[in-house]
Amino acid sequence: MCSEQVAAVKRGDEQGGADDDCSEVIRIASLASRLRAWQQSKAGYCTGWVIAVLGLCTVLLGCAPRGSTAPAVIQSPQLERVVVVFRHGVRAPLQGEAAAADYADAPWPQWSTPASLLTPHGRVGVQRSGAYLRQWLAQQGVLPRAGCPAPGSVAVWANTDQRTIDSGSLLAEALAPGCGIVAGHRQAGSNDPLFRPIEAGALPFDGTAAVASIMQQTGGPAALLAGHAAELQAMQHILGCTRTPCDFARMPSSLAPSTNGRGLALEGPIDLTSGTGEVLLLQYAEGLPLSQVGWGRATPERLAQVSRLHALLFDIYARPHYMASRSGAPLAREVLQRFDDAQAPRLSVFVGSDTHIAALSSLLGVHFHLPGYGADDPPPGGALLLGLWRQADGTRVVRARYLAQSLDQLRTLARLDLDHPPLQQELALDLCAPEQRMACPLPAFAQALETQLKLDP
């Protein structure tokens, strides 16, 4: 401490041989002493300035008087644990996915990758998403900045489709390069109850009850289409519809139980346009020549419009409570378990499809809308992140965000890092109280989610 030597300067004593640590302090104090003498002769004009100079000694140079208390350091929130639900990367279209294909004026482009599989282009996109997430998690202290994470601190689990298995493997390597983390999964093609609880028979499902509940909650497919005339017009413009007229807005809609009662049977404009819209987005994201992206008529604006048509499918199959409380329940329970268990991995990654993200989002009460996409449409390689944060006061809160590459980032395989991030959106957790939706206390979050998981009869 320099306080005694500074006091001597104030008295006018000489200070030869001062310590290096105090020399600058003494110089400032000496200057202040001379200024004080001048100030006294000038009727106090500079009192405030002298005090400021003396204050500089304390604030900048750390020469607080003995016995003083240093200001408390305000701690920033710490990210303790993360659960991520990824959608697989860019894939080739599913067999029959473009249900409105016959309305097109020209043949559809051919893909070199077999139907439903991750494309080579899509593989690179997944790697880049994973590498970015690794940088962000390292910045937050969840992953190490160098080297491998501690054993058991990272877990990756994928659904049984080949595209999700491959995406999981790519993400595991990107999140911890060279560390040998293996993305787990059940036998390829089987029904994993975590991702397909209805198909696996893990939860009760009655098609008639499902239809009744969906109709009551949403008004049905025709009601969901209300207000989307512009999106339907965009689809018609891209397809051409000169050989076969396609006035989607005038087509009838119906929703019924499937033949076996274990699913839904949807007919009408949403069924025709949702998958077709997704195929058009995949053409652009894959990097096909623009002349092959909707035959040159799928502008970015129109792609965003047909992306919304794709998302309408989830308003039938995933977001209504009857569906979400079944399709999204296993993943929701994983979130609760991993946030409650201090021994759980700090990072848990689940790799599934857009339906899983939509169902879990519905249970959480979150909505997202990223530039270039339709509202609530999960892009390829996008992810829903749920973070458990410890506040400065020790309170643990849950925060949600959505991140995904833009269509142009996917198309060009753009560089991704902390200076060149993907699209991101902080999400409000509407299952929590209004004042808690951006940072929901863990007990309130768990209680609200348990309520959401109660099955409709």
Predicted regions and their residues:
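Cationic, low-complexity basic patches in intrinsically disordered or flexible, solvent-exposed regions
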Residues: 5, 11, 15, 40
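Bacterial N-terminal signal peptides that target proteins for export
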Residues: 31, 35-51
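Bacterial lipoprotein signal-peptidase II cleavage site
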Residues: 65-69
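Signature for phosphate-centric chemistry
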Residues: 70-155, 159-348, 352-457
